[in-house]
């Protein structure tokens, strides 16, 4: 591999924002925040869903609020009163 063209592959803490679960893995993700864990400072990547909160792994149903997304879609791509798209 050519030196200087590849991103740093380092240990990063990923934090599930829905339940606070944290895990350390290696990644090239660029982050703005750091966190101290087990006496060592790591870059922090915040994620919405992990294996600790995803319904496939937990077996529990979770309702997601998509009303805002649906309204945004209808406003952007909805049909006008005359039947033609915007």
UniProtKB/Swiss-Prot annotation:
Statement: the UniProt record of this protein carries the keyword Ribosomal protein: yes
Pfam families noted in UniProt: Ribosomal_L31 (PF01197)
A GO biological process held by the record: translation
Classification via InterPro entries: Ribosomal_bL28/bL31-like_sf, Ribosomal_bL31, Ribosomal_bL31_B, Ribosomal_bL31_sf
UniProt GO molecular function: structural constituent of ribosome
Family, similarity comment: Belongs to the bacterial ribosomal protein bL31 family. Type B subfamily.
Quaternary organization: Part of the 50S ribosomal subunit.
Name the record gives this protein: Large ribosomal subunit protein bL31B
């Amino acid at each position: 591999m050519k030196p200087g063209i590849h991103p740093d592959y380092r240990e990063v803490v990923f934090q599930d924002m829905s339940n606070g679960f944290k895990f350390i893995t290696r990644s090239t993700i660029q982050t703005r925040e750091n966190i101290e864990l087990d006496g060592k400072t790591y870059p922090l990547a915040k994620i919405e869903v992990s294996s600790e909160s995803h319904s496939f792994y937990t077996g529990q149903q979770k309702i997601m609020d998509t009303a805002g997304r649906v309204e945004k879609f209808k406003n952007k791509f909805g049909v006008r009163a005359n039947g033609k798209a915007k």
